[in-house]
């Protein structure tokens, strides 16, 4: 399951990603309809889903601040809102990497993705690793 942050809702990303991603694509608000979902609640909501991969452009609040958790994956894209159309292609590249091409390979990982690389850390390992894409 791919879960998009509230900043990405209504931009058509659900549809574009849904064309090639075989699982469900949703937005975080569907986990708590009718309420504002604050960043500190997102990990709690993600733990309720089955192996979700959370996508956000709000990287300052998650990258190196969020703890990796074996029940989900966080992927941060340091992009301004006007460049969010780049997310589906970048996400697809990340999901093709052998380290992250399965849910099991992604769980427990926090990533920051740019056009050229994926920086990531994992549960119980605070070291940041880098892969080229």
Each predicted region: which residue ranges?
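Proline-centered flexible-loop/turn and helix-kink motifs
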Residues: 21-22, 50
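Acidic, metal-binding active-site segment of PIN/NYN-like and related structure-specific nucleases
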Residues: 46-67
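Short, solvent-exposed coil/turn elements at secondary-structure transition points
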Residues: 31-33, 60, 80
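A short beta-strand-loop structural module common to alpha/beta enzyme folds
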Residues: 23-33
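Acidic, PIN/NYN-like endoribonuclease modules and their adjacent C-terminal/linker elements
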Residues: 1-6, 10-21, 40, 62-133
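Conserved beta-strand termini and adjacent loop/short-helix elements that scaffold enzyme active sites
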Residues: 28-30, 57, 77, 113
């Amino acid at each position: 399951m791919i879960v998009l942050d509230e900043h990405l809702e209504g931009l058509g990303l659900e549809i574009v990603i849904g064309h090639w991603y075989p699982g469900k694509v949703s937005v975080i608000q569907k986990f708590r309809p009718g309420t504002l979902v604050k960043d500190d609640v997102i990990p709690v909501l993600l733990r309720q889903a089955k192996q979700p991969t959370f996508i956000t452009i709000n990287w300052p609040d998650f990258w190196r601040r969020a703890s990796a958790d074996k029940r989900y994956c966080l992927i941060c894209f340091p992009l301004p809102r006007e460049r969010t159309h780049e997310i589906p292609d970048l996400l697809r590249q990340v999901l093709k990497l052998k380290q992250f091409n399965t849910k099991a390979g992604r769980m427990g990982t926090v990533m920051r993705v740019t056009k050229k690389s994926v920086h990531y850390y994992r549960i119980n390992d605070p070291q940041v690793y880098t892969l080229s894409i």
